[in-house]
Regions:
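Switch/coupling sub-region of P-loop NTPases
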Residues: 132-141, 153-279
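Glycine-rich, charged/polar anion/phosphate-binding loops
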Residues: 67-69, 80-85, 166, 202, ...
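Phosphate-interacting basic helix/loop segments used at nucleotide- and nucleic-acid interfaces
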Residues: 1-14, 66-67
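P-loop NTP-binding catalytic core
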Residues: 17-134, 176
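Conserved P-loop NTPase
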Residues: 271-300
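Short hydrophobic/charged patches on amphipathic alpha-helices used for structural packing
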Residues: 4, 126, 204-205
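Conserved lysine of the Walker
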Residues: 145
Length: 300
């Protein structure tokens, strides 16, 4: 396939195709001064690109058609694939986005070496994780939330049991006692099939029966936060990621619909680790944990 080379490159983080007549673009971990790099890979026609994305979908056991023009799936290697087919929902035609995840877990030592965390921040988060606290890694999109979350999980003692719940399995954990659950979507099949969907809320409740020491949700967006809060109250270590620009914005999002977290439940959260992309001296961009904010009760 035309994108075989970037797919095999472990330093390529994202591959994007916005139209058949535009060059394939990618995000590269070693060239952080650029947002997107344009390659010399192009497709000759819309039909060629459609045929390719259909073959790609079939390799994952799914289909993408004019009747079902949106597909969100995962490759056998664990990479996330998003496709829009033809011009049913996207202009000017078929588009593709592939998010490639590291094949091996990134350790805390690596995160410190790359400057994502200072040694003091790392020590604090390590202690909080070992003590089974409730940690939310928050930040905007593509700011390194999942990478930081994965590195925190490597600090958990190997004798502890970890349960992860995700829409798309992204986390890689070097633990023998690791239970990984993922959602099942029946979108686009039929209205009756929606009864067989398995969402994050149901998975978090199911995970409690596996007696994990830690429950990890890839990202909270809805009612699964209720089950996660209950798990924290029961003494489980809880970690998750969340989209927010600041601790104040995170708290505001948690308070309003569809999350609607009661004020008292916010005190269960130990801290927010805030990540973002920052521009360094020389123009390069890097992901950094900029702040660790603890939740403190207001004085009455």
């Amino acid at each position: 396939e035309k994108i075989h080379v970037p797919m095999m490159d472990p330093d390529v983080e994202e591959i994007g195709i916005t139209a058949w007549n535009k060059p394939v673009a990618l995000v590269h971990r070693r060239f952080t001064e650029y947002d997107w790099l344009f390659t010399n890979i192009t497709y000759h026609s819309e039909d060629e690109l459609r045929n390719f994305v259909q073959r790609l979908a079939q390799k994952t056991g799914k289909t993408v058609t004019v009747a079902k023009p949106i597909l969100d799936t995962m490759s056998r290697e664990g990479d996330r694939i998003a496709i829009t087919f033809a011009d049913e929902v996207s202009r000017p035609g078929t588009t593709l986005a592939i998010r490639k995840f590291p094949r091996e877990p990134l350790t805390m030592a690596y995160i410190i070496k790359t400057g994502t965390l200072t040694p003091l921040m790392a020590a604090y988060l390590w202690i909080m994780t070992e003590q089974k606290k409730y940690i939310i890694v928050a930040g905007p999109m593509a700011s390194g939330k999942t990478t930081l979350l994965g590195s925190l999980l490597t600090t958990i003692p190997p004798t502890r049991k970890i349960g992860t719940v995700e829409d798309t399995p992204e986390l890689r954990i070097p633990h023998e006692q690791w239970e990984s659950l993922k959602t099942r979507s029946m979108w686009g099949v039929s209205e009756e099939a929606s009864a067989f969907e398995v969402d994050l809320f149901g998975l978090v409740k199911a995970m409690l029966r596996f007696r994990p020491d830690y429950i990890v949700v890839g990202e909270v967006r809805g009612e699964e936060i209720v089950a996660l809060n209950q798990a924290a109250l029961l003494g489980h270590g809880c970690l998750t990621t969340f989209h927010a620009e600041s601790p104040e914005a995170a708290l505001a999002r948690l308070r309003v619909s569809p999350l609607n977290v009661p004020e008292g439940h916010l005190l269960i959260i130990t801290c927010f680790a805030m990540t973002n992309r920052v521009q360094l001296h020389g123009g390069t961009w890097a992901r950094r944990c900029l702040e660790i904010a603890e939740i403190e009760p207001k004085e009455s």
